[in-house]
Structure formats: C-alpha cells, structure tokens
Amino acid sequence: MIRRNPRGDLPVVHETAFVDPTAILCGHIIVGENVFIGPYAVIRADEVDENGHMDPITIGAHSNIQDGVVIHSKAGGRVEIGEYTSI
C-alpha cells in the first residue's frame, strides 16, 4: 500500500522496483531501480521536526527489503540505504 503522510508526501517508487501488495510505504520515501520490498514490510517517513521539515528515507538501487522489515525515520533523522543492500 502506497500512502501519503500527514504532510501530504507520497512515496516515489522507480518503475522497475517491486513492492509486495502487503507492504506499506508511507510518506517521503524514494525507492531506486530494481529494488525489492517484500511482504509485510513497513517503511514510514511520516514525522516532521519542529520546523515542519522531514528528510526522506532513500533506498538505493538493487537493494532488497525482506519480509516483515520495519523502517521508520524519526523527525530530524535521515535514513539512507545504499545500493546492493539486503535488510
């Protein structure tokens, strides 16, 4: 499920990426090419800092986020997952 965060940001998913229908992606997320996001994974970038700013969660090309993984960025925290990474 791809959904907006309270600020209105929608994930950007490369056309070659695969997101399992049971996975949840919410907010300011950038998913690179040939990324695999497995069943029941949850990736949330939905908290802003006191100035309303939010850094994205970025998943580099050719990475895979396996079944049931949860990634959540807190306000003011940047999450960058490099290329060819498996979590």
Where are these regions (language model features)?
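Right-handed parallel beta-helix/beta-solenoid
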Residues: 26, 46-53, 74-76
